């Protein structure tokens, strides 16, 4: 078995690249999209569904799993893979983004971040060491360091201090879990807000620490699309070429295409499943709102170009009926389709990169989503 953490690049096309990352629970082919299973399950989707649509890795949330059911309870059940019956790789984020989203319910200090649970108001402290310990209990294949995600609009003075804190926390995470200590991988998270020089500084400081991969954090937090893309194309090439690059929490299909074009390998976002539950579906012709009356007697498939179970089996009319009747099956069928769309997107990207035609592939998505194209 190849050592977990081995990252192989198979082909490049411009900055875009395709390869594979070896983990303790299998190989992840990149570029990859990771369905989000916040509390240990991808909403409305069973592990068998994920297998059927070709998911290779899913994401879990450290903050939520720590609060409920508790990381120690999960550890007693053999870890998250045994607990949720997903046998392929799992990435857990550090919970930092969720904690910092609590705003008035948290306090940041050198030691870590103190916060109150959104469930019952109980007080907790996340230190870098604690976050690593929680993720070790979950036994995820890829663990993330604790970082400070600054909000959009934070000034330079605050952001500069935050970069220093994120670096110190990252070092403490690495010290708490030395490289090669077990089969779990540990990724660093670069920050820097919306200042290019601070992004560059954060990347330099984090890459001096021997992490198994590196993430771009703090993007897609309310900033204009043009600003996000400018920072993405500035930052991604600065990350080590021989390690996997992860763009956290991003995003739309065209965001992912742009991320791949910038040299990013890994993506996650709640968008496909959240939009599925709201009746917004992604197709080869763009977004479709299944609630619209025009689909009430439409016997055609949701997307003729899609081969997922939903599109092979059911009509738009039936899907609209399920949604308007508030049937739970609508959530499952819509989610199967949207996740298939996102996974097909990265599968197509891998093929396009290998064939040397990624620029053409990118243009095809720009034609589908012209409103998202940044000049």
Swiss-Prot record:
It catalyses: 7-aminomethyl-7-carbaguanine + guanosine(34) in tRNA = 7-aminomethyl-7-carbaguanosine(34) in tRNA + guanine. One of its GO terms (biological process) is queuosine biosynthetic process. Pathway: tRNA modification; tRNA-queuosine biosynthesis. Its EC number is 2.4.2.29. GO terms for cellular component: cytosol. Keywords: Glycosyltransferase, Metal-binding, Queuosine biosynthesis, Transferase, tRNA processing, Zinc. Substrate binds at residues 93-97, 147, 191, 218. Binds 1 zinc ion per subunit. Residues 249-255, 273-277 are annotated as: RNA binding. One of its GO terms (molecular function) is tRNA-guanosine(34) queuine transglycosylase activity. It is an enzyme of class 2 (transferase). InterPro entries: ArchSynthase1/Queuine_TRR, TGT, TGT-like_sf, tRNA_ribo_trans-like. The active site is at 93 (proton acceptor), 268 (nucleophile). Its cofactor is Zn(2+). Pfam families: TGT. Catalyzes the base-exchange of a guanine (G) residue with the queuine precursor 7-aminomethyl-7-deazaguanine (PreQ1) at position 34 (anticodon wobble position) in tRNAs with GU(N) anticodons (tRNA-Asp, -Asn, -His and -Tyr). Catalysis occurs through a double-displacement mechanism. The nucleophile active site attacks the C1' of nucleotide 34 to detach the guanine base from the RNA, forming a covalent enzyme-RNA intermediate. The proton acceptor active site deprotonates the incoming PreQ1, allowing a nucleophilic attack on the C1' of the ribose to form the product. Homodimer. Within each dimer, one monomer is responsible for RNA recognition and catalysis, while the other monomer binds to the replacement base PreQ1. This is Queuine tRNA-ribosyltransferase. It comes from Nitratidesulfovibrio vulgaris (strain DP4). The lineage of its organism: Bacteria, Pseudomonadati, Thermodesulfobacteriota, Desulfovibrionia, Desulfovibrionales. The gene is tgt.
């Amino acid at each position: 078995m190849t050592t977990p953490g081995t990252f192989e690049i198979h082909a490049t096309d411009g900055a875009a690249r395709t390869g594979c990352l070896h983990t303790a629970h299998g190989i992840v082919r990149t570029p990859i999209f990771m369905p989000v299973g916040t509390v240990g399950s991808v909403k409305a989707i069973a592990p068998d569904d994920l297998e059927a649509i070709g998911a290779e890795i899913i994401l879990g949330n450290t903050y939520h799993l720590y609060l409920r059911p508790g990381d120690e309870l999960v550890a007693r059940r053999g870890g998250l893979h045994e607990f949720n019956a997903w046998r392929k790789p799992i990435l857990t984020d550090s919970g930092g983004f969720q904690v910092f989203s609590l705003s008035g319910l948290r306090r940041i200090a050198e030691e870590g971040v103190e916060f109150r649970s959104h469930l019952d108001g109980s007080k907790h402290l996340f230190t870098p060491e604690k976050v690593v310990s929680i993720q070790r209990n979950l036994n995820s294949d890829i663990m993330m360091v604790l970082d400070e995600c600054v909000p959009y609009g934070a000034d330079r003075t605050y952001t500069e201090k935050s970069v220093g804190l994120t670096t110190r926390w990252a070092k403490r995470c690495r010290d708490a879990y030395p490289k090669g200590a077990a089969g779990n991988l540990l990724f660093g998270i670069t920050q820097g807000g919306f200042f290019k020089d601070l992004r560059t500084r954060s990347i330099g400081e984090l890459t001096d620490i021997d992490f198994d991969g590196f993430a771009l954090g703090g993007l897609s937090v309310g900033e204009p699309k043009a600003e996000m893309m400018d920072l993405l194309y500035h930052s991604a090439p600065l990350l080590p070429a021989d390690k996997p690059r992860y763009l956290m929490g991003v995003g739309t299909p065209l965001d992912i295409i742009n991320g791949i074009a910038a040299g990013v390998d890994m993506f996650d976002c709640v968008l496909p499943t959240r939009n599925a539950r709201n009746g917004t579906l992604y197709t080869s012709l763009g977004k479709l709102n299944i609630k619209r009356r025009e689909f009430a007697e439409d016997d055609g498939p949701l997307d003729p170009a899609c081969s997922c179970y939903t599109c092979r089996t059911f009509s738009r009319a039936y899907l609209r009926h399920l949604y308007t009747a508030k049937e739970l099956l609508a959530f499952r069928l819509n989610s199967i389709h949207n996740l298939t769309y996102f996974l097909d997107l990265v599968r197509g990207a891998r093929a396009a990169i290998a064939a040397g035609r990624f620029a053409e592939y990118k243009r095809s998505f720009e034609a589908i989503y012209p409103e998202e194209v940044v000049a």
